[in-house]
Structure formats: structure tokens, C-alpha cells
Amino acid sequence: MVKLRLKRIGKKQAPFYRIVAADSRVNRNGQYIELVGTFNPLKDEVKIDKELTLKWLNNGAQPTDTVRSLLSKQGILKALHESKFSKNTQTENKKPVSKKTTKKSKDN
């Protein structure tokens, strides 16, 4: 399963994180599939590529609790919800076409 999670980089007492899409079986600072954004907790600075994040979330990637919090603060989860909701309402608004049965009249 692919997860969106934090990968710690930086020095001691100066944490800096990359927000990455990674296989859940790989360790925290191991290989990752794609870099999605960065997070600097000392300056409370978050930079996230919205398109990449939405791509991974639509493909089934699960964010960790911390990343979910960061995504909601950036408004990305709201955008994901609206995109899914708008797709559902468009399909629900279309009425299914029913076939009407016609009776054949006999000419006698």
C-alpha cells in the first residue's frame, strides 16, 4: 500500500521533512516513490504540490495522521472531497432511461 508520509532530513535539533509517496513496508527514511512536498516545523512552513498530491490520493494512497493534518490545513483534502462529490452529483442527476413496453395491436 502506498502512503503519503513524512521523511525526516536535516540536522539534530533542526528537523526538516519531505512529504513523500512511499511503500508502507519501507522504513521512514528509506526509498520513496515520489516527492510531493516539504514541511519545516521550525518556521511552520509547508509547500505541497497540489496536483501530485491529488493524483496520489485519487490512486488510493493513504496519508498518515500528520500528513492528513497538513493537507487539510492547505485545503487539499477539501478539494479532493469536492472533486469526488461533484462527480457523484453529476452521475446522480442523470436519470436512467427506461424502456417502455409497447403493446402490439392486432388488425382483425
Curated annotation (Swiss-Prot):
Q: Name one GO molecular function term.
A: structural constituent of ribosome
BP GO annotations: translation
Q: Name one GO cellular component term.
A: small ribosomal subunit
- Keywords in alphabetical order: Ribonucleoprotein, Ribosomal protein
Region Disordered, annotated ranges: 82-108
PROSITE patterns, from UniProt?
RIBOSOMAL_S16
Query: Locations of Basic residues compositional bias?
Result: 96-108
Q: Which InterPro entries match?
A: Ribosomal_bS16, Ribosomal_bS16_CS, Ribosomal_bS16_dom_sf
- Extract the HAMAP family matched here: Ribosomal_bS16
Which protein family is it in? Answer: Belongs to the bacterial ribosomal protein bS16 family.
Name the NCBIfam families on file. S16
Name by which UniProt lists this protein: Small ribosomal subunit protein bS16
Source organism (scientific name): Mycoplasma capricolum subsp. capricolum (strain California kid / ATCC 27343 / NCTC 10154)
